């Protein structure tokens, strides 16, 4: 820029002239060179309307010649604009997986409090697609500045995001990604690769066993999470490629009738007494882990997901062999950061942001800290 301080800048009305510019280029310097008002320069820099094409072109030419980089941080602080974000998450109990996501959301929004940001969290029933539709319609009516959503089934998510796009509202996916409906950014694991990896770990435990079981939580045929479905797809892909002769059994526990879990597990193990290996793709591996403890079954290998307190307890007590973690706090925090970077600081945002696939054992759990 210093070489350009004494450059010939063309003024449409006055031709070329030498300009002595200060070390720090100010908006009023650009306005003088472009022969426009300070307000016009400000509108061009921040992409606002109300500027003629001729004035916009002159300002942009000078900005380019000076390699001017606006101080978006200072501009945002000086602005009185308020930014409202809404997050749409599955309903959950305190202490479950989504509680950690909420923690990340609130911690992130607090760091941007100087920029008049606020966040509201709305919920939908993950086992009821109409609940998602109703919750999304309520968000659209409010027309927030940005949205973060944990997607449900693609066809229902697309109905929501199509309307967000029509309203020019940027949106973030967390937990699971829908490739046919690209967001501003996605934060979460590569679900299929995670399931593929989980199958490999499962078979390191199972060795030559010919039967394994997948435990699910289902309500009226709905698993309640795209990510769980994609993990299972990846899991089955690995098994088909490397252990095609291994039988994969299934036990679907009722999502809303937890009091029946132990009875259903008892019936399963009476029917399949030789099964010694299983996995659950949701965050409630503790349901099976606590059952195994209560029945004194110490010869069963169980893999689960997420560092819920009850899962970690089962891991330490031996009824869960491995836990796969995905840093939910960071997903929530990074989603808010991406919205702020895009809307407030006008930064480019990376679209696909995969979280690591972290494998935790009883020997490593006490030394693990999500980043």
Show the residue positions of the predicted features.
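N-terminal helix-turn-helix DNA-binding module of bacterial transcription factors
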Residues: 10-76
